[in-house]
Every structure is written in structure tokens, then in C-alpha cells.
């Protein structure tokens, strides 16, 4: 049976991941730990014999720089890269920049978990005059006001991620191209929900760790056969637990 592989990679730890802050569309740098995670992911993919025909990422530098580090370790810095805002992290509205633990102390662990992980619940929205509104950012100048979020749930994130997947990425995988997507926790959760047909309840508990390659294998009809993380299982579980605990008051 012909098998085509896709690699999903959440960016390495960012400075705001390290500070336990809601990030969303805020364009923050990788932390030093995040850079090392990205380099390690590239080395691991190289050791496992992976190479790619094209890469996809968001327009946020923590994902872009993660991809750069990976492609450098794969000796594929020349690889074609498609960048799209549709692969951006979910927009966290007025929560962007706030510390997650402090927000949990104010509103409670359960409310913050719902804001972070529930399927259709949106955080408090920005207003268009807020400096954090993406309409003030030149990289989104070509987008209409209807396309620019004031806040997003996972459900509304899916509304931009899955059409992009279906129109731009899936046909290339179906044609046999080897693809890596370097993106974000929630844009990747949106894609995983679609690929694995997860329920709204199941997606709440899904945590994607930073800097760990997630491999999907598809048959010729683009049906996922199975998926698996590359790396040490104990370390991967620890990173998933760390993601889950970010929104707790402590």
C-alpha cells in the first residue's frame, strides 16, 4: 500500500510560552529553549530519514523561525515555503498578553480552561481601536474587516484552517508530495480534530507539545492510517502535561 507522510510541528517554546502568557496573534520570538527544541526536531527528522517537497507555515515568526531551524538541520534551506495567516494561532482577543496563571486566579481554573480549550467559547473580544487589533498590522493589510478577528474560538479557527488545508495542502499530499506544516497549538488542534474526527469533548483534552514532530500517514485516498510523535515518549508526555497546566492558578 502506498503511504504518504505529513509532519505537523508546533513551534518551539516562545518567549511568551516561557512567561506563561496568552499569545495568539502577537508576534513574539522563540525562547532559547524554543530554538533548541526546533533544532532538535530537525535533527530527529534528519535521523529518521525525512525530507520534504514543500513546507507551510503561518505569518508569525515563532513558527517561521522554527521551520528555518528544522530545514537547516535537514540541509533543505532552499525548500519552497508557503506562508498564510490562515495557519496563525487562534486569536485570544483581550486575553493576549495576560499571564495565564494570574488570569486563572482572577476568573478560576475552569473558566480559563474553557477559554483555552473549549470548542466554541471565545475569550473576551478586542475592540478595533485596540493596538492589538490585527487591522493595525501591515502584514494583514490585504484582508477585509470581516476576515480580521477580534477574538476566536477553536470553532472559528477551524473555519479558516480547514478550507486552507482542503484547497492548498491536501491536494499536494494526495499527489504524493512530502509536506511539513510548522504552525501553532490551536491551528494544529483544528487540523487534528478534522483528520481524526474528534468530538468537541475530545478536542478539549488534546494538548500538542512544542517542538515535537507529529507524523500522519495517509493511504492513496487521503484517509489517515495512523499517527505518532517522534521522540522520547516520557519527554513528550511531560511537555503535553506542561501545556495542560499552563492555565492553572497553581
UniProtKB/Swiss-Prot annotation:
Pathway where this protein functions: Carbohydrate degradation; glycolysis; pyruvate from D-glyceraldehyde 3-phosphate: step 3/5
One annotated GO biological process: glycolytic process
Protein residues bound to substrate: 10-17, 23-24, 62, 89-92, 100, 116-117, 185-186
SMART domains attached to this UniProt entry: PGAM
Gene3D superfamilies on file: Phosphoglycerate mutase-like
Active site, renumbered: 11, 89
PROSITE patterns: PG_MUTASE (PS00175)
EC number: 5.4.2.11
Assigned keywords, A-Z: Gluconeogenesis, Glycolysis, Isomerase
Example of a GO MF term: phosphoglycerate mutase activity
Highest taxon in the source lineage: Bacteria
InterPro entries per UniProt: His_Pase_superF_clade-1, His_PPase_superfam, PG/BPGM_mutase_AS, Phosphogly_mut1
Catalytic reactions of this protein: (2R)-2-phosphoglycerate = (2R)-3-phosphoglycerate
Feature type site, description Transition state stabilizer: 184
Subunit structure: Homodimer.
PANTHER family per UniProt: PHOSPHOGLYCERATE MUTASE
Database matches in NCBIfam families: pgm_1, PRK14115.1
Similarity comment: Belongs to the phosphoglycerate mutase family. BPG-dependent PGAM subfamily.
General function of this protein: Catalyzes the interconversion of 2-phosphoglycerate and 3-phosphoglycerate.
Name of the molecule in the record: 2,3-bisphosphoglycerate-dependent phosphoglycerate mutase
Organism listed in the record: Edwardsiella ictaluri (strain 93-146)
Amino acid at each position: 500500500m502506498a503511504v504518504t507522510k505529513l509532519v505537523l510541528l508546533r513551534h518551539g517554546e516562545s518567549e511568551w510560552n516561557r512567561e506563561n502568557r496568552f499569545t495568539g496573534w502577537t508576534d513574539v520570538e522563540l525562547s532559547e529553549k524554543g530554538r533548541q527544541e526546533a533544532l532538535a526536531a530537525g535533527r530527529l527528522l534528519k535521523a529518521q530519514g525525512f525530507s520534504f517537497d514543500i513546507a507551510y507555515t503561518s505569518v508569525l515568526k515563532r513558527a517561521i523561525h522554527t521551520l528555518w531551524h528544522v530545514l537547516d538541520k535537514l540541509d533543505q534551506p532552499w525548500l519552497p515555503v508557503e506562508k498564510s495567516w490562515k495557519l496563525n494561532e487562534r486569536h485570544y482577543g483581550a486575553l493576549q498578553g495576560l499571564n495565564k496563571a494570574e488570569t486563572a486566579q482572577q476568573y478560576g481554573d475552569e473558566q480559563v480552561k474553557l477559554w483555552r480549550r473549549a470548542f466554541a467559547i471565545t475569550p473576551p473580544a478586542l475592540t478595533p481601536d485596540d493596538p492589538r487589533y490585527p487591522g493595525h498590522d501591515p502584514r494583514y493589510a490585504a484582508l477585509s474587516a470581516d476576515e480580521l478577528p477580534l477574538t476566536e474560538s477553536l470553532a472559528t479557527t477551524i473555519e479558516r484552517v480547514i478550507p486552507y488545508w482542503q484547497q492548498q495542502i491536501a491536494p499536494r499530499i494526495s499527489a504524493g508530495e512530502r509536506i511539513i506544516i510548522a504552525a501553532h497549538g490551536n491551528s494544529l488542534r483544528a487540523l487534528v480534530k478534522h483528520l481524526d474526527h474528534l468530538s468537541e469533548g475530545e478536542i478539549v483534552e488534546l494538548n500538542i507539545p512544542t517542538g515535537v514532530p507529529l507524523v500522519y500517514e495517509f493511504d492513496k485516498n487521503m484517509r489517515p492510517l495512523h499517527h505518532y510523535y517522534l521522540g522520547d515518549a516520557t519527554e513528550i508526555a511531560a511537555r503535553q502535561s506542561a501545556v495542560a497546566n499552563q492555565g492553572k492558578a497553581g
